[in-house]
């Protein structure tokens, strides 16, 4: 029986025309931390698009490659690219078995993309994936609704809280920003 690789928390928050995405660095197999400094975020399409993943690293890299091809094909049109990626991911016999979730964002939109064909744009400009995603989402939602903190500070605090609660999330956090 194959043990499941568990990881991570990746979050994206939009506020005041700024987009901040962050991901922790922990990769866990069973009860063992395999790596504490994994990089789960990428800048794509001439640094105009942020992307993060949760799930299998090899699968995520395969998806990043496909997604970059879609961005080139559709001249950086994020919404069209994510819809086409989701369609291909769901219908392709090989891609269908990939185990990962993607968060992608530009200055106008943020999307969660899954292999089930889901393309979700969050209502409040907050979305998080991975085992710590629900904790980070809850913290970010409370901070966005009740404070004037910047998107960066909201993401920092949300990742800190997720790392304190989720055993598959650490405090070694990488950030990417767009304005």
From Swiss-Prot:
Belongs to the peptidase T1B family. HslV subfamily. Gene3D superfamilies: Glutamine Phosphoribosylpyrophosphate, subunit 1, domain 1. The active site is at residue 8. Protease subunit of a proteasome-like degradation complex believed to be a general protein degrading machinery. Its main location: cytoplasm. Na(+) binds at residues 163, 166, 169. Allosterically activated by HslU binding. One of its GO terms (biological process) is proteolysis involved in protein catabolic process. A double ring-shaped homohexamer of HslV is capped on each side by a ring-shaped HslU homohexamer. The assembly of the HslU/HslV complex is dependent on binding of ATP. Its EC number is 3.4.25.2. It comes from Solibacter usitatus (strain Ellin6076). InterPro entries: ATP-dep_Prtase_HsIV_su, Ntn_hydrolases_N, Proteasome_sua/b, Proteasome_suB-type. This is ATP-dependent protease subunit HslV. Keywords: Allosteric enzyme, Cytoplasm, Hydrolase, Metal-binding, Protease, Sodium, Threonine protease. It is an enzyme of class 3 (hydrolase). It comes from the Bacteria. One of its GO terms (cellular component) is proteasome core complex. It catalyses: ATP-dependent cleavage of peptide bonds with broad specificity. One of its GO terms (molecular function) is threonine-type endopeptidase activity. It is found in: Cytoplasm.
